[in-house]
């Protein structure tokens, strides 16, 4: 059998692509080295932020707004346990922060619902937060967080129900490009398709070693917190920049545990074996202490944590491009630790590619040619 589309890597983007392409009527094969959702990539840990006024650059705003529409649609499949939670996101940092300047610019350009607060305004609204006098907050009322593993599970189930073939726990060992399509090699045999999507995350270089993607081991952890920090008490998700430039992110507490992680830094690794579990690196449990001590002093001890992996591009912007010399293969990689919120729209872009549809978005900033 020859498929219309083979998806290599069925984590966040791959799961979405499988659903949207199958729903569009294509004959699709989803593959993954493990059984998604799983603990081997970048999507585990239950939650991911979604921010609209994007501090990483205005070029992302059209993508994230479309992503939000698709997340809202997906959430309707899980109304008892919604995939998207509109908690709001407060972005904290010094008044001269370049990141916050980008947030403000994105909000202005796209007329997004963002409220600016000074330090006193932040602490009056959320007494649990402490910031210096020179800090500001940009509060995104319409943003919040996503339940990442539930989203992937839902997409995979919906794709399967729509007739998508799924080959999991079976790594792709090679990709061959031929005149009439793409062939993948697996322990289960060879499979052919007219087109392929490669969204294999951290270990994409195992298949395509020429790609400029660097795996980085990252950690996040849950700390003891009471009901004051919960969504029910209107405590928001957050990003926070310390005076030294370190960037943190976190979520409202659930079950008396607040999740927080540090966005920058991490341990460069070169193989999956190097991504050791949480707490096997001495600094894992204390990485968030500088932020907690200064900004959230009421949070308690570290309860537990997890390690994940970023697939960083050299400039930490996405790579969305066809494989050089092979227009029938689309790469979506280098998501650099800020990609999950875009998984829905990236999956839709992949499905459009498989149907020979022109994308509605300007993807020029994400081309591989920028690294030449």
From Swiss-Prot:
Disulphide-bonded residues: none
Known EC number: 1.5.3.-
Gene Ontology MF terms: flavin adenine dinucleotide binding; N-methyl-L-amino-acid oxidase activity; sarcosine oxidase activity
Enzyme class: oxidoreductase
Gene Ontology CC: one annotated term: cytosol
Record-listed S-8alpha-FAD cysteine modification sites: 308
Keywords annotated in UniProt: FAD, Flavoprotein, Oxidoreductase
Keyword Cell membrane: no
Keyword Flavoprotein on entry: yes
Catalytic activity field: N(alpha)-methyl-L-tryptophan + O2 + H2O = L-tryptophan + formaldehyde + H2O2
Origin: domain of life: Bacteria
Residues where FAD binds: 4-34
Alphabetized InterPro entries for the sequence: FAD-dep_OxRdtase (IPR006076), FAD/NAD-bd_sf (IPR036188), Me_Trp_Oxase_MTOX (IPR023493), MTOX (IPR045170)
HAMAP family documented for this protein: MTOX
Subunit and partners: Monomer.
Family the entry assigns: Belongs to the MSOX/MTOX family. MTOX subfamily.
UniProt xrefs under PANTHER family: FAD DEPENDENT OXIDOREDUCTASE DOMAIN-CONTAINING PROTEIN, PEROXISOMAL SARCOSINE OXIDASE
Name under which the protein is recorded: N-methyl-L-tryptophan oxidase
């Amino acid at each position: 059998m020859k498929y219309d589309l083979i998806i290599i890597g069925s984590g966040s983007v791959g799961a979405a692509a499988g659903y949207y392409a199958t729903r569009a009527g294509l004959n699709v094969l989803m593959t993954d080295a493990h059984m998604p959702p799983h603990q081997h990539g970048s999507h585990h840990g239950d939650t991911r932020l979604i921010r609209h006024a994007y501090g990483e650059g205005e070029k992302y705003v059209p993508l994230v707004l479309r992503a939000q529409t698709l997340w809202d649609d997906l959430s309707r499949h899980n109304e008892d346990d919604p995939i998207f939670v509109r908690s709001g996101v407060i972005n904290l940092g010094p008044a001269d922060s370049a990141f916050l300047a980008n947030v403000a610019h994105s909000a202005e350009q796209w007329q997004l619902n963002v409220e600016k607060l000074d330090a006193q305004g932040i602490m009056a609204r959320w007494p649990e937060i402490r910031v210096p006098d020179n800090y500001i907050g940009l509060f995104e009322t319409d943003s919040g967080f996503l339940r990442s593993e539930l989203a992937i599970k839902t997409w995979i189930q919906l794709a399967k129900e729509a007739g998508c073939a799924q080959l999991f726990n079976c790594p792709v060992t090679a990709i061959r490009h031929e005149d009439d399509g793409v062939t993948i090699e697996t322990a289960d045999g060879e499979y052919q398709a007219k087109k392929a999507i490669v969204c294999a995350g951290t270990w994409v270089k195992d298949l395509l070693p020429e790609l400029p993607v660097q795996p980085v081991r990252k950690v996040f952890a849950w700390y003891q917190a009471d009901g004051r920090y919960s969504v029910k008490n209107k405590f928001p998700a957050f990003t926070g920049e310390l005076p030294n430039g370190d960037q943190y992110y976190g979520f409202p507490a659930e079950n008396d545990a607040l999740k927080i992680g540090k966005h920058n830094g991490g341990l460069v690794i070169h193989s999956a074996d190097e991504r050791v579990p949480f707490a096997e690196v001495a600094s894992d449990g204390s990485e968030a202490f500088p932020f907690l001590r200064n900004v959230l002093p009421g949070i308690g001890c570290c309860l537990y944590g997890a390690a994940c992996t970023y697939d960083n591009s050299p400039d930490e912007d996405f790579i969305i491009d066809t494989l050089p010399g092979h227009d029938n293969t689309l790469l979506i990689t280098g998501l650099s630790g800020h990609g999950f919120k875009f998984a829905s729209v990236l999956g839709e872009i992949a499905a459009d590619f498989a149907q020979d549809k022109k994308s509605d978005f300007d993807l020029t900033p994400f081309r591989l040619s920028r690294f030449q």
